[in-house]
A protein has these predicted regions:
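N-terminal leader/linker segments that initiate helical-solenoid repeat arrays
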Residues: 7-62, 77
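Helix-start (N-cap) detector for alpha-helical repeat units in TPR-like alpha-solenoids
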Residues: 25, 57-58, 91, 96, ...
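Residue-level recognition of tetratricopeptide repeat
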Residues: 32-33, 65, 104, 138, ...
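Structural signature of tandem alpha-helical TPR/SEL1-like repeats
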Residues: 39-42, 73-79, 109-118, 143-155, ...
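Canonical positions in the second alpha-helix
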Residues: 47-50, 82-83, 121-122, 155-156, ...
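Structural marker of alpha-solenoid helical repeat scaffolds
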Residues: 52-53, 86-90, 125, 159, ...
Length: 218
């Protein structure tokens, strides 16, 4: 008898059914994610069928990310937020993931204020995700909240020192507030990690141009 069978044999029938159901749902979600990569419209249609069989959290998640893949960013983001706040038995890790993905969808939709609100909620659930701090920084920078963005990037760098993306974003923010020395310092650190990054090389040109304009003519 397999290990799974042995474990199942020691459980009441209802518990065995729950475990099997969760496993089946996870397989179905994995299929949904794979389907989105090749045919998001079909994945969305399948999600509606799945929703009709019980409106389970993973079915709602499949539906939301399929909508995002179909460029229905605002609707997908709203559904992810609703799922993150739902009373279902959803882990804190999953709730944070749903809010983070909602924030990124709002940001892609050109709504950085809504994105920041979603990232705030996600950060209330976890303070150890450097990428999440970078995400909120991006939302703040999109609103020209340069110093708020820099605070988040400092938090990201405290978790992952010398992260080229975080350093590049902070260099861009420092350039925006005319801290050219700080921008140059962060940029050089970023280039040490990713010397051929096109965005960083463009940023270097922008900083040099700002420095040139700042230098008095002879």
């Amino acid at each position: 008898m397999s290990l799974i069978a042995l474990l199942m044999a020691g459980l009441p029938l209802s518990q065995s059914a729950i475990i099997l159901n969760r496993r089946d749902e996870q397989i179905r979600l994995n299929t949904c994610i794979e389907q989105i990569e090749t045919d998001a419209e079909l994945a969305y249609e399948d999600s509606l069928v799945w929703l009709a069989t019980g409106n389970r959290p993973l079915a709602r998640y499949c539906n939301a990310i399929a909508l995002i893949a179909l460029d229905e960013l605002e609707e997908g983001a709203a559904r992810l937020e609703a799922l993150a706040n739902a009373p279902d038995a959803i882990t804190l890790t999953d709730r944070s993931l749903y809010m983070t993905q909602a924030g990124n969808a709002w940001l892609s939709a050109g709504l950085p204020e809504a994105a920041e609100t979603a990232f705030d909620a996600a950060l209330n659930m976890t303070q150890t995700d450097a990428d999440l701090f970078k995400d909120r920084a991006a939302a703040r920078l999109a609103q020209e909240n340069w110093f708020g963005g820099m605070d988040d990037l400092a938090s990201a760098l405290a978790l992952v020192p010398n992260d080229a993306e975080a350093l590049g974003l902070r260099a861009r923010a420092k350039l925006a507030v005319a801290d050219l020395s700080g921008a140059e310092e962060d940029l050089e650190r970023a280039l040490d990690q990713d010397a051929e990054n096109i965005e960083l090389l463009v940023l270097r040109g922008d900083i040099r141009e700002a420095r040139r304009r700042q230098t008095p003519a002879p």
